[in-house]
């Protein structure tokens, strides 16, 4: 499976905004031309492509004072009173395999509201990326247990039209090397493909091991992206 820019890829240039205008509208807030998720769901915010000073002001009003805004590939420079917090280079990768991952999903279970404390604990210990008490409401989350303890998980995050992002892929350091991440990503990819959508993901450029895993599973790099975080005045 290969794609060109005529295959609905344009929505992936603004996956946060496209998600908040569509599938995740009920999990976000809007003001003017800006949008953001509810703070207990995610810290991602979206600005229009032709951003103006008024848009930054609208986003600041939406978020409130001293709030965090996590931006996907935002090339625009914020006003000087916005505090830079981080810059992270990464990749956007698309599923380029067939209609199924062929992964073994033995031991994979669906996670629900009752599992959130364990999910937050695993996230805190492995640091795969931002995850909040209501992040699981963005989509399906799957996990693997060992002796009843949650040791690996992954889930669905951004949902631009026709696509589903796989995210929060993490494994307890004590059980790494057993193929848990591959099974979880494969199981999620199969679910996404089965409903007629296409899987994609984002990964930090410095995470060479994860990039290699995703390439083995059937993902290819579409483009390099820069993630930026700012704090409102």
Task: Walk through the language-model features, giving the residues of each.
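Conserved active-site alpha-helix within GNAT-family acetyltransferase domains
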Residues: 77-82, 182, 205-224, 231
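Acyl-donor-binding surface of acyltransferase catalytic domains
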Residues: 2-103
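Conserved hydrophobic beta-strand within the GNAT/NAT acetyltransferase core sheet
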Residues: 166, 199-203
């Amino acid at each position: 499976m290969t794609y060109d820019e005529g295959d609905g890829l344009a929505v992936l240039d603004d996956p946060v905004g496209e998600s908040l205008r569509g599938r995740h509208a009920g999990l976000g807030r809007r003001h003017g031309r800006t949008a953001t998720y509810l703070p207990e769901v995610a810290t991602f915010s979206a600005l229009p492509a032709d951003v103006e000073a008024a848009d930054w002001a609208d986003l600041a009003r939406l978020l409130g004072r001293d709030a965090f805004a996590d931006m996907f590939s935002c090339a625009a420079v914020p006003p000087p009173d916005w505090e830079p917090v981080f810059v992270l280079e990464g990749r956007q990768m698309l599923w380029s395999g067939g209609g199924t991952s062929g992964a073994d999903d033995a031991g994979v279970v669906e996670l629900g509201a009752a599992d959130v404390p364990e999910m937050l604990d695993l996230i805190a210990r492995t640091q795969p990326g931002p995850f909040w008490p209501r992040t699981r409401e963005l989509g399906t989350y799957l996990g693997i247990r060992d002796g009843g303890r949650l040791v690996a998980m992954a889930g669905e995050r951004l949902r631009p039209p026709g696509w589903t992002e796989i995210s929060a892929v993490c494994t307890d350091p004590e059980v790494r090397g057993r193929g848990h991440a591959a099974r979880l990503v494969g199981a999620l990819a199969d679910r996404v493909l089965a409903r007629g959508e296409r899987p994609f993901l984002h990964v930090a450029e410095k995470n060479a091991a994860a990039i290699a895993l995703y390439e083995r599973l059937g993902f290819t790099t579409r483009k390099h992206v820069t993630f930026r975080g700012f704090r409102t005045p």
